[in-house]
């Protein structure tokens, strides 16, 4: 089973998220006419500067749109790289590769299709996030084909356990609370649920373990 959220065909992940999340809230739409393969997205979303100075320069509405897209990008990576099967990535996804909304760029200019290493430098924090997920996956073969125990939740959260790891995905902007004791499996010590530690979070998220519950934002 191949797991992916971007490939050489269609929009890049970053462009998909810009079009579906940020562009709609900022009043952009799919382009028409001769640009049928292009999604019209504000240029600032593509040429993002995620330094605090860069975000301040684009104004609060655009800055929030950028943060939302980045958070969704990280969430997408987290889902793919903790899923069973074989993860697949478009080259450059790890630094938010953009083709400026072009979904069919096979006959476009080399400037549109090449990998922008300056962008990679500016998005190095996102690269670091991908690198940590990849290292985590490579450290335990159970990410590939291990059993997954699903933990019931009251909201939209997806929570499952793989080996000694608990993955909690919260796609909403509401705080979710998970009973980590419900993730116990045969062979756990009676107090194991008290010793979970947070290895990483995506987007604006915060995850903290206290006693028998984990809060995910």
Task: State what each model feature region is.
Residues 1-181:
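Loop/helix patches that line or flank the sugar-binding groove of alpha-linked glycan CAZymes
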Residues 173-217:
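C-terminal beta-sandwich/jelly-roll accessory domains of carbohydrate-active enzymes
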């Amino acid at each position: 089973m191949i797991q992916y959220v971007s490939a050489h065909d269609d929009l890049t992940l970053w462009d998909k998220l810009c079009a579906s999340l940020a562009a709609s809230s900022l009043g952009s739409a799919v382009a028409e006419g001769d640009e049928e393969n292009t999604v019209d997205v504000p240029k600032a979303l593509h040429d993002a500067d995620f330094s605090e100075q860069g975000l301040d320069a684009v104004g609060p509405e655009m800055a929030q749109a950028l943060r939302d897209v980045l958070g969704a990008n990280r969430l997408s990576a987290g889902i793919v790289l903790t899923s069973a099967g074989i993860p697949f990535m478009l080259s450059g996804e790890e630094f938010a590769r953009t083709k400026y909304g072009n979904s069919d760029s096979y006959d476009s200019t080399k400037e549109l299709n090449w990998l922008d290493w300056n962008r990679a430098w500016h998005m190095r924090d996102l690269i670091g996030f991908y690198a940590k997920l990849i290292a985590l996956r490579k450290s335990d073969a159970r990410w590939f084909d291990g059993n997954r125990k699903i933990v019931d939740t009251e909201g939209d959260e997806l929570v499952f356990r793989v080996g000694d790891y608990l993955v909690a995905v919260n796609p909403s902007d509401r705080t979710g609370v998970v009973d980590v004791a419900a993730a116990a499996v045969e062979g756990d010590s009676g107090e194991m649920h008290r010793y979970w530690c947070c290895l990483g979070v995506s987007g604006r998220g915060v995850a903290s373990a206290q006693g028998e519950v984990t809060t995910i934002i």
